[in-house]
């Protein structure tokens, strides 16, 4: 009976250790809704990013407005307004490229699209999700070029 009590004590100690090891909080995830929102927010906050520029330049609606503009200032204003109208979406498939050993950082990739009027541009976007020691998550997006 003494042996059974010792085993029970050891098993309950292991159970407590397992439960406590999960208290560190969730690992960073590539495909969480917060991560997706953060990636789109980072990219959309830059009105002059190459993706929205490309979509604006390839929009027939924008091109029609540009052809009716007579001055460079008008053309510049049309392009600026078009870029500000850009809408963004992160594709359904997000890939986890790597995880750090301490499970505080993941690198990820996904397809980002920017739409301006009748034109949509797609580009792979790479980003990193990090969990700080205080448990807060941060997302950084690798700049991309066309």
Pin down the residues of each PLM region.
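Sec-dependent bacterial lipoprotein signal peptides
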Residues: 1-21
């Amino acid at each position: 009976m003494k042996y059974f009590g010792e085993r029970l004590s050891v098993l309950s100690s292991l159970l407590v250790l397992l439960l406590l090891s999960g208290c560190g909080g969730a690992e960073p995830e590539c495909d969480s809704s917060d991560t997706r929102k953060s990636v789109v927010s980072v990219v959309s906050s830059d009105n002059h990013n190459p993706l929205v520029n490309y979509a604006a330049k390839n929009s027939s609606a924008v091109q029609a407005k540009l052809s009716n503009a007579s001055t460079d200032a008008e053309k510049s204003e049309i392009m600026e307004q078009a870029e500000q109208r850009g809408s963004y979406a992160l594709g359904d498939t997000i890939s986890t490229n790597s995880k750090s050993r301490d499970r505080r950082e993941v690198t990820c990739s996904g397809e980002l699209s920017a739409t301006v009027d009748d034109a949509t541009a797609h580009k792979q976007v790479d980003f990193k999700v990090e969990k700080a020691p205080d448990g807060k998550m941060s997302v950084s997006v690798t700049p991309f070029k066309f």
